[in-house]
Amino acid sequence: MNAIADVQSSPDQRNMPINQVGIKDLHFPLQIQSAEGVQHTIARIGMTVALPASQKGTHMSRFVALMEKQTDALDFDTLHKLTADMVALLDSHSGKISVSFPFFRKKSAPVSGIQSLLDYDVTLTGEIKNGTYSHNLKVMVPVTSLCPCSKEISQYGAHNQRSHVTVSLIANADVDIEEIIDYVEAQASCQLYGLLKRPDEKYVTEKAYENPKFVEDMVRDVATALIADKRIESFVVESENFESIHNHSAYAYIAYP
């Protein structure tokens, strides 16, 4: 039987390295380890490595093969190992893995105490550059915002809307997903719940009215809370308000430092 040609391992004559090459949007079942336990989820995964100028292509099948061997619940320790294993398997000096997934948290309604799940979008990223590893945590938290100006100028009521507050951070020690959610929800006009009864709806309506926030207030208040946490070295916080009286969003962004 004739040997099958290994085209991607052949030399390339253009003398041009590639910063990152690999796969993206791999849908894969995973377990996620968080402070509140292990969750089963379906993740969207991106896996890339640096490719030297001398090599025509990377070994695409090896990325999926590596994930097929992944059995441990994912946290930053297992992500570090997975990233290092990928770089070694692909014979590279640099590589990145990003894992995006819906994260669910059980919450109790503020008055009735009835429990329900609320979902958050989370991305864990691990990267090795020339032997040095770093990781990033990104969490999108949906909240309620109520406009201070609308409250001030109106005889009754004020416009309010859902907002998405996204925090992306690098830390020098472990920071749990739940901690970032708590930081953001504490600064919102009111947090969201999956299920509310009438007494709960009354509570969240009045709480938002008593705690109005511009989009600028939201990012400043969240940033202040993050700066106070000495584990967090750098971050970006964004807030997008899906304005109920406009057909556009209000947006604010802070990067620290």
Predicted regions: what they are:
Residues M1-P257:
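N-terminal intrinsically disordered, cationic/polar leader segments
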